[in-house]
Amino acid sequence: MTVRKYTDQDIGELIRIWNEVVEDGIAFPQEEELNMRSGAEFFASQSYTGVAEEDGKIFGLYILHPNNIGRCGHICNASYAVSKNARGKHIGEQLVLDCLKKGKELGFRVLQFNAVVESNVHARHLYERLGFTQLGTIPGGFRMKDGYYENICPYYHEL
């Protein structure tokens, strides 16, 4: 498995994987799925979009961009998506490790996750194992697909 920069030829697969996570309604704040036009614009607008690929097949992706502007512009934010049929194979770990490296290369000093859903224990365990620090808990900060309000846990990692 390698992680590389996305190309325009990847857009269809990136949209498919992204929309799987949006449709699940338990991890991403977005409610609207991407189409070819909005997806191409979305991935191009990121500071970096990485894809996890093996034997020409894309299994996951991450997006990396500033978390804020101006005096806080040195803090970046990222989101990760792994195809449903590839989960549990440590692809997320490879995406996070590549993202940490890429964030530093791009001049960011901190990677911050704003809204890790508290019940997303696999992601939280991974982040903590990789040295991320939880900043606290925001009660009811994420509206799940079923309407339930779940706590969110912001995390950060110095680059």
Tell where the protein language model's regions lie, with residue ranges:
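A short beta-loop-alpha structural element at the N-terminal edge
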Residues: 2-14
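Conserved beta-strand-loop-alpha-helix junction that forms the acyl-donor binding cleft
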Residues: 113-123, 141-146
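Conserved GNAT acetyl-CoA-binding A-motif
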Residues: 103-116
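Acetyl-CoA-dependent GNAT
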Residues: 8, 27-85, 96-97, 102, ...
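Terminal substrate-recognition subdomain of acyl/acetyltransferases
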Residues: 80, 138, 146-159
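Helix-loop element at the rim of GNAT/NAT acetyltransferase active sites that forms part
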Residues: 15-32
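Conserved acetyl-CoA-binding loop-helix of GNAT-fold acetyltransferases
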Residues: 82, 88-105, 124-129
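Conserved acetyl-CoA-binding loop of GNAT-fold acetyltransferases
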Residues: 128-138
